[in-house]
A protein has these predicted regions:
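ATP-binding/phosphotransfer module of carbohydrate and carboxylate kinases, centering on a glycine-rich
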Residues: 1-65, 75-81, 98, 102-106, ...
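Conserved A3 ("GATE") glycine/threonine-rich loop of ANL adenylate-forming enzymes
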Residues: 14-15, 116, 140-143
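General beta-strand structural signal in soluble alpha/beta enzymes
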Residues: 108-112
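Glycine-rich phosphate-binding loop of actin/hexokinase-like ATP-binding domains
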Residues: 128-186
């Protein structure tokens, strides 16, 4: 392998994904293992992580340009590690950069997971060529990343705000962070399963509802995911006025519902703000071209791919 290669890893709530990635966003080698880490087991988790990293480095004789790491959480201003890591609380306050540097002596880039997803989609997927691009990551949690002229928009903790907690239904269902009626509580996995319990009369996991809606063989699942799409269109109508993206990409496990989700999202978005965006596009003199909403082009390794983008494009 003579081309530049980077190693990326994505620490998820249930699974940690590790891969060798080239500058074209292709994953050349991949492995994963269960995250399962508590404060008492942090050392064993880090040992496992470093062993898996070394195993991939050995495949290319250690000839990589650097290591990119991503996780769900806020990164400190010095970019040394998470000061708040929602899916792995044991990582709070850990200087991950120093640990990786001491172990592997390679350049290290840390990025929060929504910006990793957004950078991957912007660089290699449906966001290519757009000046202002938004990516809505839809899973257990919900968050949006924004790219402005090639750079991720970063506020507190390296994120473009905590957009998943925008209130859609005041006094509505409570999310895991205590917000009442926020987008995450309505659109995320908990919202899907809550609707499932109401409409099926018994518990059904979100992944099954999503799969059935995509395959088109379950009217209840289709109805649930259509409602999720309507909520999504409502959220994006508000966010689009703040960030004025030219394209919005839906990514994550919930977006795998496909056409039923996308159609309902576009329907609600168009009904609420379609005329606004067309009007501004018409009179902007080419500065703004309007907005369209699409499904992600990338698969479930988006996080680790996005973790290394800045190594190839510093």
């Amino acid at each position: 392998m003579n081309e530049p290669i980077a190693l990326g890893f994505d620490i998820g709530g249930s699974k940690t994904k590790i891969g060798l990635v080239n500058r074209y966003g292709e994953v050349l080698a991949y492995n994963d293992f269960p995250t399962e880490v508590q404060a008492a087991s942090l050392d064993s988790f880090l040992r496992k992580l470093f062993e898996e990293i070394q195993a991939l480095l050995d495949l290319v004789d250690g000839k990589v340009i650097g290591i990119g790491a991503t996780f769900l959480g806020w990164i400190d201003d010095a970019r040394t590690g998470p000061f708040l890591c929602m899916n792995v609380p044991a990582l709070h306050g850990i200087n991950l950069r120093a640990l990786l540097d001491a172990e592997f002596h390679l350049p290290v880039v840390l990025i929060d997971d929504i910006n990793a997803h957004t950078l991957a989609e912007y660089t290699y997927g449906s966001g290519q060529g757009y000046r202002r691009f938004m990516c809505l990551a839809m899973g257990t949690g919900l968050s949006a990343g924004v790219i402005i002229h090639g750079k991720p928009l970063q506020f507190t903790g390296g994120c473009a705000g905590d957009t998943g907690h925008v209130i859609l239904r005041p006094g509505g269902p409570v999310c895991s962070a205590g917000c009442k009626g926020c987008a995450e509580a309505l659109i995320g996995v908990a919202g899907i399963e809550r609707q499932g319990l109401e409409k099926y009369g018994s518990y059904k996991p979100a992944y099954e509802i999503i799969k059935n809606a995509r395959e088109g063989n379950d009217p209840i699942a289709i109805d649930i995911m259509r409602q999720i799409g309507l909520y999504t269109g409502e959220l994006l109508a508000s966010l689009s006025h703040i960030f004025l993206p030219e394209r919005i990409s839906l990514t994550g496990g919930i977006a795998k519902a496909g056409k039923v989700l996308l159609d309902a999202t576009n329907e609600q978005f168009e009904q609420l703000v379609g005329d606004y965006h067309r009007l501004y596009a018409k009179f902007s003199g080419g500065y703004y071209s309007g907005v369209d909403i699409v499904l992600s082009k990338l698969e479930d390794k988006t996080g680790l791919i996005g973790a290394v983008v800045q190594l190839f494009n510093p």
